[in-house]
């Protein structure tokens, strides 16, 4: 009987995994033994990290959007039909259209979403770069500011040891902001204040979620005159008076609030009953090695949806996708998964407009900070403008 593999989500995780599966299972597909299908809530594919460049007017945004169908191998059936129900007992997902998508193997790659409403006043008084709409809004403010204070805040999920989306992004954008304001000739008149919560995964009273990087950041920030303060866990924002208040009892006024807002899993995941995350955040309980949803034999997950202590970023997905694809292929062929995820993350951080820093880590080793360089920035920009689309197609 033909086996059906269903991928829910047309972002980086879903697209890479679908294409990798199509390649690995081509013999079975050609023998009509396997069927691959993807459902997504959009006909478009968005390269999410591109929004960061829009915030500093280094990109317009349209260059980071492609037709989703064009990124998928022809062997993959694609449907624009937002998932509204997941039934793991009967092995189906229901779309908004009412159509039922049956599966033998399910891959949940639904990502995460901004949940600014979780902090009172943040939606009204804050800005962020985690969406193209948000990036365009904050870009207008950055382009107009002549003097004052830009406050940077970072929020973590309530669920222990789960990071926010793209852990290095607040540092990247703080450094990019310094360069951008310098380009505009107003840096001397604009104060940048970078804050970090008291508790950030395994780190307390630091400036980053991993200790080695946290220890070097004060020197990095001091070199570009960025003020920094730990122990500032954002609790609420007064949008009218432009004041941010922390759980620790501190308050900081601002002219622009650039925040890493709270995040949560997609609504279909939060409504599924599969998550054990705190505060209905929706992160899926994930086996750290196989990337299966814990307790479910035929359901995998990867990317921003998981509850693992690794970055919710493309550099993580790039290594996870092979594990998921290889394990499903092995289960079909041998009856059991064969690969184990080691927590590896590989990326290049944009540490300013013209400086890039390669970074890598896994479950055993934290990021070891390395010098940033123009070559690193060239690598990152090259990936943004071309190599990403090859990676999404499963070619890298």
Residue ranges and their predicted role:
Residues 124-146, 252-256, 260-319:
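FAD-site-proximal beta/loop scaffold in flavoenzymes
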Residues 325-396:
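C-terminal, flexible cofactor-proximal segment of oxidoreductases
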Residues 10, 97, 110-111, 154, ...:
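Glycine-rich, N-terminal phosphate-binding loop of Rossmann-like dinucleotide-binding domains
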Residues 1-3, 76-183, 258:
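FAD-binding core/adjacent interface of flavoenzyme oxidoreductases
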């Amino acid at each position: 009987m033909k086996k059906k593999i269903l991928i829910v989500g047309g972002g980086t995780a879903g697209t890479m995994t679908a294409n990798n599966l199509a390649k690995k299972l081509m013999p079975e597909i050609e023998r009509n033994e396997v069927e691959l299908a993807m459902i997504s809530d959009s006909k478009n594919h968005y390269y999410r990290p591109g929004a960061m460049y829009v915030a500093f007017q280094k990109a317009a945004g349209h260059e980071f959007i492609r037709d989703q169908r064009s990124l998928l191998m022809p062997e993959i059936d694609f449907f624009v039909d937002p998932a509204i129900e997941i039934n793991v007992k009967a092995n189906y997902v229901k779309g908004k259209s009412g159509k039922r998508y049956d599966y033998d193997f399910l891959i949940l790659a639904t990502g995460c979403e901004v949940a600014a409403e979780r902090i009172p006043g943040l939606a009204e008084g804050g800005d962020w770069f985690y969406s193209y709409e948000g990036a365009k809004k904050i870009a207008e403010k950055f382009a107009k500011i002549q003097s004052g204070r830009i406050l940077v805040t970072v929020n973590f999920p309530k669920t222990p040891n789960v990071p926010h989306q793209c852990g290095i992004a607040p540092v990247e954008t703080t450094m990019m902001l310094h360069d951008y304001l310098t380009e505009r000739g107003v840096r001397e008149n604009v104060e940048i204040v970078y804050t970090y919560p008291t508790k950030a995964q395994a780190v307390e009273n630091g400036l980053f979620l991993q200790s080695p990087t946290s220890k070097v950041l004060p020197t990095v920030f001091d070199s570009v005159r960025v003020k920094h303060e730990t122990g500032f866990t954002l609790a609420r924002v007064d949008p009218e008076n432009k004041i941010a208040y922390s759980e620790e009892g501190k308050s900081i006024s601002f002219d622009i609030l650039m925040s890493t807002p709270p995040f949560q899993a997609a609504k279909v995941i939060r409504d599924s009953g599969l998550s054990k995350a705190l505060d209905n955040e929706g992160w899926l309980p994930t086996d750290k090695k196989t990337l299966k949803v814990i307790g479910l034999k035929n359901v995998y997950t990867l990317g921003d949806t998981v509850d693992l202590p690794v970055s919710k970023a493309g550099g993580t997905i790039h290594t996870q996708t092979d594990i998921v694809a290889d394990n499903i292929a092995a289960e079909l062929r041998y009856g059991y998964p064969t690969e184990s995820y080691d927590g590896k993350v590989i990326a290049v951080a944009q540490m300013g407009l013209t400086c890039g820093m390669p970074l890598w880590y896994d479950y055993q080793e934290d990021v070891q900070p390395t010098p940033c360089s123009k070559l690193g920035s060239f690598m990152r920009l090259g990936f943004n403008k071309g190599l990403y689309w090859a990676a999404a197609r499963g070619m890298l």
